[in-house]
């Protein structure tokens, strides 16, 4: 129905470009099937982008360098899922190393520790996000930097820390 589609599009525009959302954000506008169909039509028309199954984005457009559509990052999608599910997440492995600047490698599949539901999310770019259930003590850090450092050092391994790592 066009009315639901207009309501959804107006709300998405208010949130701004780069916003990640799902059908559950628009349940006040109508029946779940109608909302899903409206999102499907909007994605087909190019107003929004389907990032993963059930997850959409109002894309940013790069006008300065003419790069076109800028897709949301792993972090944006993962943070949206965590917020929606009321879960805590923290990146692990090579992605934690990349976030800290200890590695230039950007992994194709990112793994997050979570206290929420474990799952795999396939992004349309062929990449993926994996949420692995963990003990609450692994998420108990009060400082995000300390948590990332701990997980990055775990990835590097005991005795494998080099002078180059220490310089960063």
Report the location of each language-model feature.
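Generic structural signal for hydrophobic core residues of well-folded globular domains
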Residues: 81, 100, 152-156
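Hydrophobic alpha-helical interaction segments
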Residues: 133-168
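Short gly/ser-rich loop at a beta-strand->alpha-helix junction or flexible surface loop bordering the NTP-binding
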Residues: 51-54, 87-124
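Amphipathic alpha-helical interface surfaces
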Residues: 35, 92-93, 145
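Short coil/turn segments at secondary-structure boundaries
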Residues: 22-23, 109, 165
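Short beta-edge/loop segments at beta->alpha junctions of small alpha/beta modules
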Residues: 1-80
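Basic nucleic-acid-binding interfaces
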Residues: 84
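A short, charged helix-loop
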Residues: 122-133
């Amino acid at each position: 129905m066009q009315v639901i589609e207009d309501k959804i599009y107006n709300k998405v525009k208010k949130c701004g470009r780069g916003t990640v959302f799902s059908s559950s954000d628009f349940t006040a506008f109508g029946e779940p099937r109608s909302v899903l169909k409206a999102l499907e039509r909007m994605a087909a028309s190019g107003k929004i982008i389907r990032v993963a199954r059930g997850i959409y984005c109002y894309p940013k457009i790069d006008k300065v360098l003419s790069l076109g559509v800028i897709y949301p990052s792993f972090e944006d999608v993962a943070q949206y899922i965590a917020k929606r599910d009321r879960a805590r997440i923290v990146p692990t492995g090579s992605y934690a190393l990349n976030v800290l600047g200890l590695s230039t490698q950007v992994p194709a599949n990112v793994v997050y520790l979570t206290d929420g539901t474990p799952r795999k999310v396939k992004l349309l770019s062929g990449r993926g996000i994996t949420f692995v259930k963990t003990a609450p003590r692994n998420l108990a850090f009060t400082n995000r930097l300390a948590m990332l450092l701990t997980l990055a050092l775990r990835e590097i391994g005991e005795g494998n820390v080099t002078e180059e790592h220490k310089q960063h």
